[in-house]
């Protein structure tokens, strides 16, 4: 799984990098960006599964970043990190479909707990998608088999029918 943190304060990103054991969580790649534009550049070159970002940043804020990123990457799980416990932000995050909302400063174990839940959600979604694809493949295979049997039923040679089964 690939995760990205976006915050305009480098010290916050450094603290997260030092305080969270990403390897223990099963996270393969962790990227950091200090602004929305850099985050979008990274997402265009590296698939990101989970995006955690600050709300208030210069230029494009975290809410705008999430809105834009979700349009391009609808499977992206988004989590807001903010030092503002503003109810309006919480409402907007719900409307945007954010997975969670973490008020900073948050202990690392709280962030890790949210990441664990988000990772579990990713794994479950991937399993559902794989099952769906297998089901589609099986359905297509069954239809192809039925088509071959039906075509061979109309042939005059009965060995053709037996060979299609």
Residue ranges and their predicted role:
Residues 10-31:
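Two-component/phosphorelay signaling modules centered on CheY-like receiver
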Residues 103-165:
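Interdomain helical linkers/hinges and coiled-coil/dimerization scaffolds
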């Amino acid at each position: 799984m690939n995760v990205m943190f976006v915050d305009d304060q480098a010290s916050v990103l450094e603290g997260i990098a030092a305080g969270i054991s990403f390897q223990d969580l099963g996270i393969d790649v962790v990227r950091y960006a200090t602004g929305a534009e850099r985050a979008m550049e990274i997402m265009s070159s590296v698939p990101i599964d989970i995006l955690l970002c600050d709300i208030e940043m210069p230029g494009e804020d975290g809410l705008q970043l999430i809105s834009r990123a979700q349009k391009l990457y609808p499977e992206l799980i988004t989590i807001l990190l903010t030092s503002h416990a503003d109810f309006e932000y919480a409402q907007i995050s719900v409307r945007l479909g954010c997975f969670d909302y973490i008020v900073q400063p948050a202990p690392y174990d709280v962030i890790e707990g949210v990441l664990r839940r988000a990772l579990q959600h990713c794994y479950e979604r991937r399993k559902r998608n794989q099952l769906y694809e297998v089901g589609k493949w099986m359905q297509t295979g069954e239809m192809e088999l039925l088509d071959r049997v039906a075509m061979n039923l109309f042939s005059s040679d009965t060995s053709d029918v037996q060979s299609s089964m």
